[in-house]
Amino acid sequence: MKILITTDWYTPAVNGVVTSVKNLQRELERRGHEVRILTLSQSLHSWSRDGVTAIGSVNAGRIYPGARLRTAMAGRWVRELMDWRSDVIHSQCEFSTFFLARRIAEELDVPLVHTYHTVYEDYTHYFSPSVRWGRCAVAAFSRWVAAQVDGMIAPTGKVRGLLQGYGVRCPVFVVPTGIDLRRFQQEGDPMRRAVLRASLGIPAENTVLVCVGRLAE
């Protein structure tokens, strides 16, 4: 299949969406699919190379740290992607590139699938002093996004439950975000581990469990 992935976030940015997109791209290509990426440039300059098309944008960090908004006209770049004729469009973000994804899907008459990465309820303090009003706005926005697509992917059952609670009517499928286990299966240096244990006061015979989580404001 030819699969076009659209995302406001891509390298060199580092966050969960970028990690998810890169993992998805790698695994789809490993299985023999052709994948192209439509994203935002880190400058006003649009470009296309190595299967990635980036549309000129400006910094929108006042809305959310690291965010960008499309400013450049995308006609030429969209036409090139239409000529490629993807079989399905997989959107990863709800803003700048989502509108391009919808436009391309409509022109090509192909399915548009969207992954709902962000629980916006947790970030309403960025735009609303009222938690209740913020949740209502998120629910309405999520319903609008769902009405534009043929199906949504939720990374967890919790997120699917939230979407259903918002009144989303399109099909919602739970597909957990994958992890590249190869990064964690490398043998460490025994001497380095011993030095680290000693520096932390952990006896050699003790089992160590490490929990990796996140802190969000």
Language-model features: where?
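Donor nucleotide-sugar binding/catalytic pocket of nucleotide-sugar-dependent glycosyltransferases
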Residues: 39, 53-56, 135, 139-191, ...
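N-terminal subdomain of nucleotide-sugar transferases
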Residues: 1-45, 49-56
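Proline-aspartate-enriched helix->loop->beta-strand connector
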Residues: 81, 85-89
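Conserved donor-binding/catalytic core segment of Leloir-type glycosyltransferases
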Residues: 191, 203-217
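A short, charged, and often flexible helix/loop element on the N-terminal side
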Residues: 49-79, 91
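Acceptor-binding helix/loop patch of EC 2.4 sugar-transfer enzymes
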Residues: 113-140, 182-187
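Short hydrophobic "strand-cap" motifs at the C-terminus of beta-strands
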Residues: 6, 155, 211-213
